[in-house]
Amino acid sequence: MENFINLITDVWNRGFFGIDLGSIISSLFIILVAFLLRGFIISVVINALSRLAGNTKTEIDDEILNALKKPLGLIPITIALYICTLILPLTGLIDEIATNVVKTFVVFTIFSALSNSIKPIFAALSAKSWLTIAIQLWLERAAKFIVWVIGIAVILDIFGIQIGPLVAGLGLFS
């Protein structure tokens, strides 16, 4: 019986790839709570802000808030991933990759919010614009494309991929 208890203790302490099961269970619990908080933030906090935005005279704040629902829902998940990197005893290359994944989530959240904000901004500007609808749609899509290209460039830079030679190799700025 004592050998069985020692076996259980050994499995608990070594766990999976040398990470104890307590840290793994804690990390999984934090991620689960983050997904629950994501729903809470989207349903409660955004709806409260929507009521406040509904009291204003303009519609642009309502539209931007609706556009930011999904990107703001990524914030708890990003924080949970960061906390998981602190809890788990990661070292070396695995720690570097985990840190880069958290940075990628931060960048993706920021650029997703920027990209989703473009449509309401263009909608607000379209009422006073002298541009045709086709040009406005083209400019809106071009702006979203540029935002995502910059976001992808930042993410590639996080993982150590040099962006300058890629852009120069394409011959875009010659």
Task: Kindly give the residue locations of the regions a language model identified.
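Short, strongly hydrophobic alpha-helical membrane anchors
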Residues: 1-21
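Hydrophobic alpha-helical transmembrane segments and their immediate juxtamembrane helical boundaries
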Residues: 22-174
